Amino acid sequence: MGMTMTQKILASHAGLESVKAGQLIEVNLDLVLGNDITTPVAINEFKKFGVDKVFNKSQIAIVPDHFTPNKDIKAAEQVKYVREFSNKMGIENFFEVGEMGIEHCLLPEKGLVVAGDVVIGADSHTCTYGALGAFSTGIGSTDMAAGMATGQTWFKVPSAIKFILKNKPAKWVSGKDIILHIIGMIGVDGALYKSMEFVGDGLNYLSMDDRFTMANMAIEAGGKNGIFPVDDKTVEYLKEHTEKEWKIYEADEDAEYDEVIEIDLSTLKPTVSFPHLPDNTRTIDNANRVNIDQVVIGSCTNGRISDLRIARGILKGKKVKKGIRCIVIPGTQKIYLQALEEGIIKDLIEAGAVVSTPTCGPCLGGHMGILAKGERCVSTTNRNFVGRMGHVESEVYLASPAVAAASALTGKITDPELV
């Protein structure tokens, strides 16, 4: 029996001719990632190993993004601790506040991840880089520490679900709507410890930003990773962002999948995830008329330039409804600057939105948009668990930038076609 795309990447990095689902393997790592929340714990564990250097100064990336710019003294102390460790170890890819971004927007932009890589990160949404044809997955701080010390980690080889995406999506259907539809269909544990492998002619209509969004949310279906085949769009992106060499892996024709699911993208509608799980989805025609207090457009899921362009296209020349807070967070400094140069920021501010420096911020209930008791938020983020963005009696509705921007104008969940 042949191997899936994920299995081929893992076999190569384990120095094996082949692997099969359920097999325990040790692999060599191309990149180890941490942030301001998870890295301090990893540093503490690293110090217990009795080693005095990291395995490779250029293959570790540390991105303070959750509570930065520092929201309080505790956050400042954590970042200081991480900064001092990075300086001591000579880690080349520590991103200070002036050059930082939300980690999963920043690393592809900086060209640190390429097709064929194996990447681990002490953040659950590390699966984002599957959009580039890499195997990437979230791990805990202890595994991050071991990865920094040895350049290796172990995996149980995942089985896979193949998603065959067909046809062209309708006007307002984005990668966010597609992945919400999939999560709603299979459930938050529907791909538990499985590779979600996306194929089909529908990929021709999905931008790289759409793919980043979809791979990012693979974990919300329980997936070990989400991954896309490398095509012309991938290669164009890689050529623009990196000088690193990449390697293309393709699934064998006789690869074995636990399930094969076909999805006709032309039949999908804008989709909203209701509280308090990402799989509690409804199409926009069954989701409207829910009154809201706040809108957040940003995050590692939807903070890229195309997302801001979509929001601008809906909000330009209009006004955010009085009493509604509309918070826009570009994913990186580069995206922020590009949005400034394109006049996007000006149009958003004139519409009544507030624009933040890059940060995870409100997504995890950290800062820059926390919800009070009883408040509701339409957010382009990736999780809507109880208390995720603030008070345990607040509510988060996950949606695309188009739905979020339209909702900011009306003060209720709104189909972008209607504004």
Curated annotation (Swiss-Prot):
Quaternary structure annotation from Swiss-Prot or TrEMBL: Heterodimer of LeuC and LeuD.
InterPro entries with a match to the protein in the record: Acnase/IPM_dHydase_lsu_aba_1/3, Acoase/IPM_deHydtase_lsu_aba, Aconitase_4Fe-4S_BS, Aconitase_4Fe-4S_dom, HAcnase/IPMdehydase_lsu_prok, Homoacnase/IPMdehydase_lsu, IPM_dehydratase_rel_enz, IPMI_cat
Entry keyword annotation includes Iron-sulfur: yes
Pathway: Amino-acid biosynthesis; L-leucine biosynthesis; L-leucine from 3-methyl-2-oxobutanoate: step 2/4
Keywords recorded for this protein, A-Z: 4Fe-4S, Amino-acid biosynthesis, Branched-chain amino acid biosynthesis, Iron, Iron-sulfur, Leucine biosynthesis, Lyase, Metal-binding
Cofactor note: Binds 1 [4Fe-4S] cluster per subunit.
GO terms under biological process: L-leucine biosynthetic process
EC code: 4.2.1.33
GO MF annotation list: 3-isopropylmalate dehydratase activity; 4 iron, 4 sulfur cluster binding; metal ion binding
Binding site for [4Fe-4S] cluster: C300, C360, C363
Cofactors that this protein relies on: [4Fe-4S] cluster
Ranges that cross the membrane: none
Entry-linked Pfam families: Aconitase
Domain of life: Bacteria
Recorded family membership: Belongs to the aconitase/IPM isomerase family. LeuC type 2 subfamily.
Name of the protein described by the UniProt record: 3-isopropylmalate dehydratase large subunit
Function: Catalyzes the isomerization between 2-isopropylmalate and 3-isopropylmalate, via the formation of 2-isopropylmaleate.
Record field: catalytic activity: (2R,3S)-3-isopropylmalate = (2S)-2-isopropylmalate
